[in-house]
Amino acid sequence: VICLTGCSHVDKTDVQAVITNELDLLKNLDSDTTQKYVSYKELFPDATKEIKLSNEVKEVFSLFFQDFDYQILDLDVDEDKKEATASLRLSTIDAASLAKDYGEASLKNAILKAADSEEQATEKNTDSMEERYLLLDQLLSNNNYATVERECTVELCNKGSNDDKDEWEIIRSHSLENNLVGGLMTYLSDNNLLSPEETLTVYLNTLKTMNTEQMGNYLGIESLFNTSDTDKNSIAAALVELFHSTFDFNISSCDEESYNAVIQTKITTFD
């Protein structure tokens, strides 16, 4: 259903055609159109290293937009100013759930990366742009995310040189990019994406997966876990195995104040 109000039918038909042509390309998973409206740099502006558009990165956008759809709700065209505004209802992937899963997976990867090396340099432990997109690709490939709806406004301008030739173009903006990806940019940049309880849960669950060397590096007891002494290695391996078999936890409460949180947690481990 398309509601058209305000000006001549011809003008609105032209504007409607531009919107339809552009957004249909997104629906058809056109990679050039995807990059025109959603720059791969915008999702992760703080990434440590830029990348060329590999097939894996392009696949992320194909997976993201595979269920994309839209509906034009209203059009308003100002012929004198050569401006137009369209109200749209977008159907996108549940970006909030995707961002939450990404936050948890990214935190787990960061913990394991720190545990894989004795060096704690921030630059070495920060994911590159490619690593972040590969993680998104993994999540989109392995999970089925619901589709959600959101309404947004799209602005257009007429670049035509005279009255005989209309050249309507959609004005690209950060807001439009964010809406087309269901608000994913906003969710990923949210420092409170994971609650304190969720952050602690990821941390403690990740400890359960660490091998002997990782645990030694991460807990700062390399001298016990990383040694050439066969007997010490056997003891360290036995301790890690015992830890894995007995470790458990239960979060009972969380008190937050500003940027700090105190979490009451019952931890079970070996004696």
Positions of predicted regions on the chain:
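C-terminal motif of bacterial Sec signal peptides marking the signal peptidase cleavage site
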Residues: 3-6
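Intrinsic disorder/low-complexity detector
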Residues: 1, 80, 205-206, 213, ...
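Intrinsic-disorder/low-complexity regions
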Residues: 10, 163-165, 259
